[in-house]
Regions:
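A short glycine-rich, His/Asp/Glu-containing loop-to-beta-strand
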Residues: 14-51
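Double-stranded beta-helix
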Residues: 99-148
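Short acidic-glycine-tyrosine-enriched beta hairpin
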Residues: 7-10, 31, 61, 73-91
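Hydrophobic ligand-binding cavity/cleft-lining segments
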Residues: 1-15
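Short, conserved beta-strand element in jelly-roll/cupin
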Residues: 40-44, 53-70, 106
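Ligand-binding loop in jelly-roll beta-barrel domains
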Residues: 32, 68, 77-80, 88-114
Length: 148
């Protein structure tokens, strides 16, 4: 099926999802684009996903604040208008710096992030997660947590 043109404005955004303390607004799912996905992600200081990897490429563009990205165990602080590209299989995480921040995210072909974000938002309550349950949920969506 061929994708159709569409426009998404702030007035038509779907409600934000709470994904482990990060607010995720889905702008385009792979169903809409027939391939890639686009989200806005924001959070307060210290918020961000634990180290993980997945089977799709992912790129982030820092819109606001400072964000510490860890890529294959090496950390770097990124400010506004910085692009971070992560090929499939790259172990990565990020944490928003002082004052919080906001990211624009695009996944590559085969991305399953928006479905995973929706499930985490619905099935994982706020607070410290049940790690075995979270690990299983993520694995069902092509994401592997890198614990320890």
């Amino acid at each position: 099926m061929k994708s159709q043109a569409f426009v998404v404005s702030p007035k038509t955004y779907e409600p934000a999802l709470n994904v482990l303390g990060v607010s995720v607004t889905v702008l385009a799912s792979n169903i809409q684009t027939q391939g890639y996905e686009i989200t806005l992600q924001s959070g307060g200081e210290g918020a961000g996903p634990p180290p993980h990897r997945h089977v799709w490429d992912e790129s982030f563009f820092v819109l606001r604040g400072k964000v510490e990205f860890s890529i294959d165990g090496k950390a770097g602080l990124c400010g506004p208008v910085t692009l971070v590209h992560l090929p499939a299989g790259t172990v990565h995480s990020y944490r928003f710096g002082a004052g919080g921040g906001e990211l624009f995210e695009i996944t590559g072909q085969g991305g399953n992030a928006t479905r995973m974000f929706d499930r985490v938002s619905r099935e994982v309550p706020p607070g410290p997660p049940d790690v075995p349950a979270l690990t299983s949920l993520l694995q069902q969506n092509g994401v592997t947590l890198m614990l320890g």
